[in-house]
């Protein structure tokens, strides 16, 4: 069958056409590692194609074993492009090949010369492959109508003439190897259908074609159709008021005495979780991990990671500001004084040039950090933490001043960082990634410098210094043109070096801010592009798990969750942070999907929160309001001896999860303009 365009409409024909954009093959049959047509393999393949409107088609395919013998096979649906794509995508896995980054995560279309085949549950759209050029976009993806249709895998093959083969494998296959852990490859994984003589199998899949909304953005067109393909019918597990109570309860537990002062620690975990994650150079073999999983001393909660971090995962500054908001609301002077003291402790460490170590504990480890190289991620100042730090300090200064407390050192903290990056902005690489304490650029790669944009704009709101706003506008143009406009962001998740979704956050926020400040429509387009990119990492459907999995036992589902990065194939509740920004997009564009997606991400971020003191996960009572950071939906893990336990939780109860939800609620009113939190109720 040929898909072609006639009078502006997409149509199917059995006749070969020069105007065709794609060709749908009958079912292929893989047996003994060889692909055959259904006819040659002794199978009958019949299709029924439903036109769902606006270039979306559902293919219902029925396959019959006519060979007269029982067959153990894989089935393969194949769609061939009749155009030459310039970009390709497998959402949450491959963004035009993941050419940025030096790790051993998947890159390109092949491994050792053989095409990658990835399971559906690694992708936000099941078994989705997308190719595009300036004029046409084409996608093939699985249906969730039944388990045979959903439990699939996807592959893309580039042919010598530049055209592509989109493939869906039935059932699940991971080949030629399995990406099973951080930068780790293990043996391939195979499932098969066993079909007796005369037995039928019916499956469904989707084909989508479009003219890309913007160049490199056919994914935006595809995402626009997802609500009708995978309808969202859930609601929030808790009211917003209860979310605030639970989150604040947990964050207060993280106030930690440290060398005569109080700081905010990054989280609580078990000793085994700490070792599993590979912190402090620990390397556990699978055998050691299995042994330690049975020892009580390694499986009780405590403060096993002494981490005090400005932003990123620890979110110490944001947590302090949220405590100040809570203290002011409740007239809790002790809590307010504690939060202010914590920020004073941090501010005292900053150098005149604005540089500061983003991890406070490293001042104790190395009294002269300028004399030591970056021994681990985050040792030296990097733009993710510096951006968060300056942004939050500016907001803290404004909040306290509004409530009668002048803390000029907090504003000075923010302006020092902003002054540094105004002076050191590069037209070649923006704000860079890693800096020395002396102010020398150590690593200029990636998109992570975008976090400085929020710092500049938030500090401008307090100081009205035009150089901050001007530099932010210039830098946003740079990062959009170099990165976001090409549907990629890199290195915002500073524990990995890969294409990721976190780095899109500052571009969404700063673009919306500049749109509201200037009224320039280009910034609204910027915000939409960055938001579409971010949402390409969101799960549009619920993957399937056995009853014995953590996901099934504790009521976790994937729809609305966000994949972490091309290096870390797991889900986290990061989308909660973008909830108010998607509400802003809804208000500015009038497009209802932004509100729907905001609610999807918000609702999903509430799954796994401990709502009653002493609730147990993995047999361990968890603190009220806590939630684990990682949800491992596919055959990838850092927290199990092997990757086979799909659908498990880790035990790292980190602070940013609560901090992001609470700041989202605060911004829903303070920034998005809602009167209260009822929009998320």
Regions found by a protein language model. Give the residues of each.
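Carbohydrate-recognition beta-sandwich/jelly-roll modules
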Residues: 2-412, 416-419
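Well-ordered alpha-helical scaffold segments within catalytic/enzyme domains
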Residues: 8, 317-333, 388-406, 451-466, ...
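Glycine- and aromatic-rich loop/turn segments at beta-sheet edges
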Residues: 247-308, 348-378, 421-442, 480-498, ...
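Alpha-helical junction/boundary sensor with strong preference for TPR arrays
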Residues: 330, 350, 400, 418-421, ...
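Active-site lining segments of carbohydrate-active enzymes
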Residues: 369-380, 394-466, 528-536
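Aromatic-lined, polymer-binding surfaces characteristic
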Residues: 442-453, 483-485, 495-508
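Exposed, low-structure sequence patches enriched in small/polar residues
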Residues: 529, 573-583, 593-635, 639-649, ...
């Amino acid at each position: 069958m040929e898909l072609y365009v006639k009078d502006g409409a997409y149509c199917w024909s059995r006749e070969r056409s020069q105007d065709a954009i794609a060709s749908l093959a009958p079912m292929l049959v893989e047996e003994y590692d060889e692909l055959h047509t259904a006819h040659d393999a002794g199978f009958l393949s019949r299709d029924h194609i439903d036109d769902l409107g606006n270039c979306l088609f559902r293919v219902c395919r029925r396959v019959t074993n006519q060979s007269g013998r029982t067959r153990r096979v894989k089935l393969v649906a194949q769609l061939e492009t009749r155009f030459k794509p310039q970009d390709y995508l497998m959402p949450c896995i491959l963004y035009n090949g993941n050419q940025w980054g030096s790790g051993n995560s998947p890159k390109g279309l092949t491994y050792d010369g053989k095409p990658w085949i990835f399971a559906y549950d690694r992708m936000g759209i099941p078994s989705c492959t997308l190719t595009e050029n300036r004029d046409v976009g084409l996608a093939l993806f699985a249906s969730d109508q039944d388990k045979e249709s959903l439990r699939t895998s996807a592959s893309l093959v580039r042919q010598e003439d530049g055209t592509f083969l989109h493939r869906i494998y039935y059932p699940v296959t991971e080949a030629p190897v399995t990406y099973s852990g951080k930068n780790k490859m293990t043996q391939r994984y195979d499932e098969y259908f066993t079909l007796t003589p005369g037995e039928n199998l019916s499956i469904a899949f989707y084909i989508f074609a479009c003219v890309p909304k913007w160049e490199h953005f056919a994914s935006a067109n595809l995402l626009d159709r997802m609500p009708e393909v995978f309808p969202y019918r859930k609601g929030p597990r808790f009211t917003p008021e209860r979310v605030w109570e639970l989150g604040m309860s947990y964050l207060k537990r993280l106030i930690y005495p440290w060398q005569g002062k109080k700081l905010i620690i990054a989280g609580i975990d078990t000793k085994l979780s700490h070792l599993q994650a590979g912190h402090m150079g620990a390397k556990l073999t699978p055998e050691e991990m299995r042994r330690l999983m049975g020892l009580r001393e390694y499986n009780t909660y405590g403060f096993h990671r002494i981490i005090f971090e400005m932003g990123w995962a620890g979110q110490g500054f944001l947590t302090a500001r949220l405590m100040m908001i809570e203290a002011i609301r409740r007239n809790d002077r002790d809590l307010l004084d504690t939060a202010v003291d914590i920020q004073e402790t941090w501010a005292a460490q900053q150098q005149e040039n604005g540089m500061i170590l983003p991890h406070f504990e490293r001042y104790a480890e190395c009294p002269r950090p300028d004399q030591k190289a970056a021994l681990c991620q985050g040792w030296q100042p990097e733009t993710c933490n510096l951006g968060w730090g300056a942004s939050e300090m500016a907001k803290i200064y404004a909040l306290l001043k509004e409530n009668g407390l002048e803390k000029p050192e907090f504003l000075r903290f923010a302006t020092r960082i902003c002054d540094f990056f105004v002076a050191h902005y590069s037209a070649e690489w923006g704000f860079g990634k890693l800096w020395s304490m002396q102010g020398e650029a150590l690593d200029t790669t990636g998109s992570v410098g975008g976090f400085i944009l929020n710092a500049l704009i938030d500090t401008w709101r307090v100081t009205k210094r035009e150089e901050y706003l001007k530099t932010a506008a210039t830098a946003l143009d740079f990062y959009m043109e170099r990165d976001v406009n090409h549907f990629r962001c890199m290195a915002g998740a500073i524990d990995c070096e890969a294409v990721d979704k976190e780095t899109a956050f500052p571009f969404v926020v700063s673009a919306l801010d500049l749109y509201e400040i200037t009224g320039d429509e280009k910034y609204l387009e910027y915000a939409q592009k960055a938001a579409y990119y971010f949402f390409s990492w969101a799960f549009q459907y619920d993957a399937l798990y056995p009853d014995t999995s953590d996901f099934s036992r504790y009521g976790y589902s994937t729809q609305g969750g966000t994949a972490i990065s091309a290096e870390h194939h797991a889900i986290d509740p990061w989308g909660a942070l973008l909830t108010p920004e998607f509400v802003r997009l809804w208000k500015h564009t009038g497009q209802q999907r932004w509100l729907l997606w905001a609610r999807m991400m918000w609702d999903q971020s509430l799954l796994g929160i401990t709502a009653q003191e002493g609730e147990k996960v993995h047999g361990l009572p968890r603190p009220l309001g806590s939630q684990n950071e990682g949800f491992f939906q596919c055959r990838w893990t850092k927290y199990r001896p092997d990757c086979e336990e799909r659908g498990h939780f880790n035990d790292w109860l980190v602070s940013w999860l609560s901090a992001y939800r609470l700041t989202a609620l605060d911004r829903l009113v303070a920034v998005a303009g809602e009167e209260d939190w009822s929009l998320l109720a």
